Each structure stands twice: as C-alpha cells, then as structure tokens.
Amino acid sequence: MMNSSLLTPSSSSSSHIQTPSTTFDHEDFLDQIFSSAPWPSVVDDAHPLPSDGFHGHDVDSRNQPIMMMPLNDGSSVHALYNGFSVAGSLPNFQIPQGSGGGLMNQQGQTQTQTQPQASASTATGGTVAAPPQSRTKIRARRGQATDPHSIAERLRRERIAERMKALQELVPNGNKTDKASMLDEIIDYVKFLQLQVKVLSMSRLGGAASVSSQISEAGGSHGNASSAMVGGSQTAGNSNDSVTMTEHQVAKLMEEDMGSAMQYLQGKGLCLMPISLATAISTATCHSRNPLIPGAVADVGGPSPPNLSGMTIQSTSTKMGSGNGKLNGNGVTERSSSIAVKEAVSVSKA
C-alpha cells in the first residue's frame, strides 16, 4: 500500500512527460527518477510525519515548530503528497476536515482566545504601567507673558505707574497725561516749594527786606544761568528767566504784606502755609520794625518809601504785561502773572 501511495504522484506527473521514443519503458523511467531523487526515509506508523503544508510549502524545522498531524486512517500519506497535484491536476481541491481542518480550527480558536486575554491584561494593568502624562503648558492671557523676566518687568512698570499717579495727585492743578509733561509739572512744583520754604524761613529770622535783597543779589550775580533760590540748579533759557521774575515778585510782595504774597502763590497753586498764618507773621514782623507799609502807600501826597510803592509794583507789572505773553516755567504766561500781581496789590491796599 505504501508503494501504491508513492507511485500515485509520480504516475500523475509522468502523464505529462512525453517519451522520446515508443520503445521507452515507463517502469524503468520511474525507477530511475526514484533512485536519483533524495526521498526521505520511510516512516512507520508509530511516529507521526511532519506535514509539508497545505499549499505546497516545506516546513523548516529549524525556524518553525513541527505541526503534528494525527494519523486516523490510511489516507494520511495520500494527504501528505496530495499537495503536488493541487495546482495542476486538482483545481477544485478542498482541505479534508478530518485531518487538517481540525488543526486549523484549533489554531484559530487559540488565537481568538489569546487576543481577549491580552486585551484584558492591558485593561487591568493599564493603570499601573500607564505612561506619565505630559505636563500641560500654562498659556498666558492676551497681553501677558509667562517668562519670569517679562513678569518682573511688567510688575516694575505697574509700580512706576502707581508712583507717578501718586505724584500727580500731590501736585495741584496737575492735569497732564504723558509722563514727560507730568514730570515737568512735578519738578516745577518742587522748585517753588523749595523757594517758598527758603523765603519763609528767612522771613522769620531776618525779615522780608533781607529776603528781597538776597534774592536780588542772587539774580544779579547768576543772571540767566542759574537761580540760587531753587537749590542752585542750572536751567537754560526762558524757564530760568521766569523763575527769577517770580522770585522777585514774591520778595517784593513779602516786603509789603506776606498775606498778599501767599495769595499770589495760592493763585499759582504753590501756597504751602495758610494765608492767615502768613498774615500774622508779616504783621508781627512789620510792627517790630516799622509802621505798616500800606498806610504809607495810602498817603498819596507824601513821598513814597524807598523800598516799595504801589506805583513801582504797577510799573513792574506793566513792563511784564507789555511782552508777547511768553510761557514761564509753570505754563502760565507772564501777562497773567502781571495781572495776578495787580490783584495782590489791590488786596493789600484794601
């Protein structure tokens, strides 16, 4: 039976070979082929044979595991060599369900069983072996940065803006919006405060006459270059001239009446002390030195005192008013300052 099974594929293949002559013996040709081909040793029924695959492919014993095929009946050898004639002589060949089909079904079942187990293991152990989540990047709001240097710079600008706002609240009549103009107002205000403190302190010590003389000497020595009553700081041009003129006006008004000088400074928004206190200081100082100057000014027929008279102040204000109305350091025209001087003189006369 083994010989018949071995001769089956050879007989089918020999049918396609054309003999060169009619006297050629088929049995001799088959014997020559079988003797030259390296056939495997005959395996008895006790040991299973490795299958060559259902599609004619050889099984590599070194790389793939040997597939065991049960030997239920005598058709196992026929099924083993049946792959030679699948592509040629048997186009409608079907895999037998008894021998090989069961093995394929078993393999499919094992594969489908291992897949749910793998998915279940990943589902149970996903929490333990899960990859670490990436840190979410904090996005800044529009117009703000997350860099530490940018944050520090923004905080510094906010502090500067708060300080500038506080300074602007301290300066009276300060309505500038840009920083440059705001700083100019603050500088002018500080200069006039220094002047007022200087004048008041010297008036308490030596009287208003000494203050006016020192202011005149300082203005004559330094000229247009600097002003000694503004801390000795040097400014250029019209700003220095206007500061010097204002100092002379305040000194002259303080010689007559300190209250009028305070009113003049209050009109400019530069009054530091109450007018009543300044009037009391001026009255006490004038009583200790001379009679009141307004009484001498009211005497029209008598000669005017050499220090100050109403006509002198009016002539000074007229000269200042005859200009073109240039701006001084506080942004007030010289014409308006002359009007303020006239008003101060009229108040002192009353």
From Swiss-Prot:
The keyword Transcription regulation is assigned to this record: yes
The Gene Ontology CC terms held by the record are:
nucleus
Identify the residues that the record assigns to the bHLH domain, covering every copy: 144-193
- Known PROSITE patterns for this protein? BHLH
Coarsely, its chief localization is nucleus
Q: Where is this region: Basic motif?
A: 144-157
Disruption effect? No visible phenotype under normal growth conditions. The triple mutant lrl1, lrl2 and lrl3 exhibit very short root hairs. The double mutant drop1 and drop2 fail to develop sperm cells.
Where does this protein have compositionally biased stretches of type Low complexity? 106-133
The UniProt keywords, alphabetically, are: DNA-binding, Nucleus, Transcription, Transcription regulation
Per UniProt, subcellular location reads as:
Nucleus
Q: Name one GO biological process term.
A: microgametogenesis
Per its UniProt record, what Pfam families does this chain match?
HLH (PF00010)
- Positions of the UniProt region annotated as Disordered: 1-22, 97-152, 219-241, 318-350
Which superkingdom?
A: Eukaryota
Q: Does the keyword Nucleotide-binding apply?
A: no
**Induction statement:** By cold, UV, ethylene (ACC), flagellin, jasmonic acid (JA), and salicylic acid (SA) treatments.
What InterPro entries does the annotation carry? bHLH_dom, HLH_DNA-bd_sf, IND-like
Region annotation (Helix-loop-helix motif) maps to: 158-193
The molecular function terms of the Gene Ontology recorded here are:
DNA-binding transcription factor activity; protein dimerization activity; transcription cis-regulatory region binding
Q: Where is the composition biased (Polar residues)?
A: 223-241, 329-339
What PANTHER family is this protein classified in?
Answer: TRANSCRIPTION FACTOR BHLH83-RELATED, TRANSCRIPTION FACTOR LRL1
Q: What does this protein do?
A: Transcription factor that regulates the development of root hairs. Transcription factor that regulates the development of sperm cells.
Question: Quaternary structure?
Answer: Homodimer.
Protein name listed in UniProt: Transcription factor LRL1
Q: Which organism is it from?
A: Arabidopsis thaliana
Lineage of source species: Eukaryota, Viridiplantae, Streptophyta, Embryophyta, Tracheophyta
Quote the gene name from the UniProt entry. LRL1
